[in-house]
Amino acid sequence: MVDIHNHILVDVDDGPKSINEAIELLKQAQSENVTDIVATPHHLHKRYSNDIEKVKIKLNELKNNSEIKKLGLNLYVGQEIRITDQIIEGIKNKEIEGINESRYLLIEFPSNEIPYYTNQLFYELQTMGYIPIIAHPERNKAIVQNLDLLFELINGGALSQITASSLLGDFGNNIRKLSLKMIDSNLAHFIASDAHSITNRPFMLKQLFNDRKLKAYYEELESYLKNGKLVLTNERISKQIPTQDYKQKKWFGLL
């Protein structure tokens, strides 16, 4: 399985603080049948800055570790880029790259809002040949209150990534239900762990397929994982037309 969003690099953000913590986290990833991992430390965040060269250096430290080599995992370079008006400048200055040098950029919103310039920025990124992947939109308060905001962005060409623990109910039943609405309305394209540590949001991809409440969604979840592989090889993601089915369906009492 491919995981396109996690925090495995040592002492660069709110992920592992030591090489031993990183090793334990990667062992846990292996136990979840994860084979390919994109390291996506926070960048342009108010507390963290990780330009792509720094990410490459820190990732090579993991790749060259003898214990990690034994795990046989494939590790790739990425960034979780906080949305700001500095993204295009960062691309031009070669501080930002797509996942594994692809056209795909993982972009995070603030937790409470979608900035007013988001549509224009996403349009400009797409004219430059990049495709924004919105990280965990189901946890954004503005989207929770109004799913039309996400529909507009997806309809405009963006993609989105749901966090596995959202579907498993770790952020509460409302977030779980919203995540399922996104799937039913073709507003999701990837599933990822957003792993930080073995105790705080570990890798949980295999657990999705052990949750019988998600059985009706196994096919979609498998396709989202396959999409992760397409990102690594910079191939086009085939997506279904987004709908507003979430406006008609009654979700009372679901799950």
Curated annotation (Swiss-Prot):
EC main class here is hydrolase
Q: Which reaction is recorded as catalysed by this protein? A: O-phospho-L-tyrosyl-[protein] + H2O = L-tyrosyl-[protein] + phosphate
Please spell out the taxonomic lineage of the organism that makes this protein. Bacteria, Bacillati, Bacillota, Bacilli, Bacillales
- List GO BP terms, alphabetically: capsule polysaccharide biosynthetic process
**E.C. number, please?**
3.1.3.48
Gene3D superfamilies in the cross-refs: Metal-dependent hydrolases (3.20.20.140)
Checking Pfam families in the record gives: CpsB_CapC (PF19567)
The disulfide bonds in this chain are: none
**Molecular function terms, GO-annotated:** manganese ion binding; protein tyrosine phosphatase activity
Pathway assignment reads: Capsule biogenesis; capsule polysaccharide biosynthesis
| This protein's name | Putative tyrosine-protein phosphatase CapC
Recite the UniProt keywords alphabetically: Capsule biogenesis/degradation, Exopolysaccharide synthesis, Hydrolase, Protein phosphatase
Q: Which family does it belong to?
A: Belongs to the metallo-dependent hydrolases superfamily. CpsB/CapC family.
Protein purpose: Required for the biosynthesis of type 1 capsular polysaccharide.
